[in-house]
Amino acid sequence: AVRIAQATGAKLFAEVFPRVQRRGAGLPVVERLTYLSEFAQMQIGDATSMVLVDAPAPASFFAYPGKPSSLVPEGCAVSTLATGTDDPVAALEALADHLGAPEDVPLAEASRPELPTGELTVETVAASLGALIPENAIIVDEAQTSGIFNQGATAGAPPHDWLTLTGGAIGIGVPLALGAA
């Protein structure tokens, strides 16, 4: 997907709650759509076409009053390259090859925030996570709105797997943590 974005200039996003995302230093950076619909709309902007790969069209999480449920801009053409019953990786590789997309793509550089001191805030929790996360850690993220800084603070951490909520207030942290152990 990163190769295709490089070749076409497209914006690349992971869905709000990807099942698992391999992240960290030495890996391509794939920005997740933000949980809050107004921020997700800013990320998507005025896109005129959207290609989905093993993901539904972006939608706001709850039916917030006065906010649209669909995050697809009006007039935006939506196409599906591959679904979960297809082989999404093979479909992406075939499209990248068809486009003559470069093999080399930008990778996250190793970087960690300084271990913070002082008041406990969403920013200092994110910085602490980024400073301390070990290689090949499995992070089970149930943060939703308070985790808004986690992605940036951990982007250059050692490679790790990031598991997210199934959506909303449905907690999955304990079962996922037990399964990961």
Model regions: which residues?
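Generic structural signal for well-ordered, non-membrane alpha-helical segments
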Residues: 1, 33-40, 44, 84-92, ...
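Glycine-rich, anion-gripping cofactor-binding loops and their flanking helix/strand elements
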Residues: 1-81, 157-180
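Alpha-helical scaffold segments in soluble metabolic enzymes
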Residues: 3, 39-42, 46, 90-94, ...
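Generic secondary-structure signature for well-ordered alpha-helical cores
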Residues: 6-10, 49, 97-105, 131-138, ...
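Amphipathic repeat-derived elements
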Residues: 11-20, 101-113
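A polyampholytic, Gly/Pro-enriched intrinsically disordered region
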Residues: 32-41, 97-108
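Non-catalytic alpha/beta scaffold blocks inside enzyme catalytic domains
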Residues: 62-64, 83-106
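Active-site diphosphate/adenylate-binding microenvironment
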Residues: 106-180
